[in-house]
C-alpha cells in the first residue's frame, strides 16, 4: 500500500518481490513458453529465467525505427529491456518507448528500471507505464538504497498483468524484516529522487 501511494497507483498495480531477481523469474514463469526477444547486450538473468521456463528466446541488437513502422518481429510476444541498461548504461528515450509500445499491442514489454535513479534522462513513471495494458516495470529498492542484502524489489503495471504475477508468486517470498526496512526507507526518502542530484 505504501508503494502504491508513492506511485499514485491502486494496490492491485503493485507486486512486491524478493529483489528484482525474483521479479525477473516470476515474470518468466508467469508467461512461460512465450516467444521472447531480449534487447542485447544486457543482464544475463533475463535469458536464464526465460529459458528455465520454456521461452523461445531470440536476441535483438537494435530496436525498430520509424522507417520500419516501429514494428517488432511478428513472432515476438514478450520483449525484455533493461533501461538504463546493465552493463552499457544506455537509455532508451521514454517518448520512443511509448511509440514502440503503442505500435506493438500484441507484445508484453518487460522494462527493468532497476537503475532508474542512476540517470537524469526521462524514464517512465510507474503511473505512466500502468496506463499501457502491456507493460511491466521492474524496480529495485536494493539498488536505489544500496542495501543488497535486503532483497526487496517490486513490479508495477496494469492490474490484470499484476494479478497473473501474484497467482504464481510463492507465499512469504518477502520476509517481514525486509518489509519493515523497506517501509522505513520509503518513509524517510527524499520526495523527488532528482533532488539528490541538484
Each language-model region and where it sits:
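Phosphate-binding glycine-rich loop
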Residues: 2-35, 53
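A conserved hydrophobic position in a structured secondary element of the catalytic/binding core
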Residues: 18, 92, 157
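Glycine/Thr-rich phosphate-binding loops of Rossmann-like dinucleotide-binding domains
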Residues: 24-25, 46-47, 88-89, 119-120, ...
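Active-site pre-lysine segment of PLP-dependent enzymes
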Residues: 67-75, 87-144
Amino acid at each position: 500500500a505504501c508503494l502504491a501511494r508513492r506511485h499514485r497507483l491502486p494496490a492491485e498495480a503493485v507486486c512486491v518481490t524478493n529483489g528484482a531477481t525474483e521479479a525477473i523469474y516470476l515474470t518468466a514463469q508467469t508467461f512461460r513458453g512465450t516467444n521472447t526477444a531480449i534487447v542485447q547486450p544486457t543482464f544475463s538473468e533475463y535469458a536464464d529465467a526465460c529459458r528455465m521456463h520454456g521461452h523461445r528466446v531470440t536476441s535483438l541488437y537494435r530496436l525498430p525505427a520509424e522507417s520500419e513502422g516501429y514494428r517488432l518481429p511478428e513472432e515476438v510476444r514478450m520483449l525484455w529491456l533493461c533501461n538504463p541498461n546493465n552493463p552499457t548504461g544506455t537509455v532508451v528515450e521514454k517518448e520512443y518507448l511509448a511509440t514502440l509500445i503503442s505500435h506493438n499491442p500484441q507484445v508484453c514489454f518487460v522494462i527493468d528500471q532497476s537503475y532508474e535513479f542512476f540517470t537524469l534522462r526521462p524514464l517512465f513513471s510507474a503511473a505512466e507505464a500502468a496506463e499501457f495494458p502491456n507493460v511491466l516495470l521492474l524496480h529495485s529498492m536494493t539498488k536505489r538504497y544500496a542495501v543488497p542484502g535486503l532483497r526487496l524489489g517490486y513490479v508495477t503495471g496494469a492490474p490484470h498483468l499484476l494479478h497473473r504475477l501474484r497467482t504464481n508468486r510463492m507465499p512469504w517470498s518477502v520476509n517481514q524484516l525486509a518489509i519493515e526496512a523497506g517501509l522505513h526507507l520509503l518513509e524517510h526518502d527524499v520526495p523527488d529522487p532528482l533532488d539528490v542530484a541538484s
